[in-house]
Amino acid sequence: QFIVDLVKNKHINADTDYSIAEAAFNKGETAMTINGPWAWSNIDKSKINYGVTLLPTFHGQPSKPFVGVLTAGINAASPNKELATEFLENYLITDQGLAEVNKDKPLGAVALKSFQEQLAKDPRIAATMDNATNGEIMPNIPQMAAFWYATRSAVLNAITGRQTVEAALNDAATRITK
């Protein structure tokens, strides 16, 4: 209902999607957006003066964003499991290794406490960690595609009036649990 009301009261457009919202923010046409570290390089290129903060509460409760986690795995069939383990433990998952990854794509908040302490000097990272602490780990499973598709359909159906919010969410729950 919250999103339906935002559209109804003309705070957001009914046809806004990620790419439209990101482009509008990067052009300075939108006052705020909810995004993550993956978007920072584009914002920086746009020369937008921005900050990152704790997501607002909703009905007095902290927001619970999905939290993505960068992982590394070793194929069970690998003939070099020991070498791969050594690389991960002694090179990649170190302050220096994560710093190299972070130079390529911002990691946001990280689980390695020593590197997180270095990153937390950046207020964007500190806020990202605060949000992650309140959040829920997003499973990296194929069923998440069904979740996102059903959720998108529910939002579109509710904001266009094709369904009530309750009916749209019930349909989404049915699709997700099939």
Task: Identify the role of each PLM range.
Residues S19, S78-E82, I141-Y149, Q163-E166:
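Soluble non-cytosolic domains of exported or imported proteins
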Residues F25, V165-I176:
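Short, well-structured alpha-helical segments that form the helix of a local strand-helix-strand
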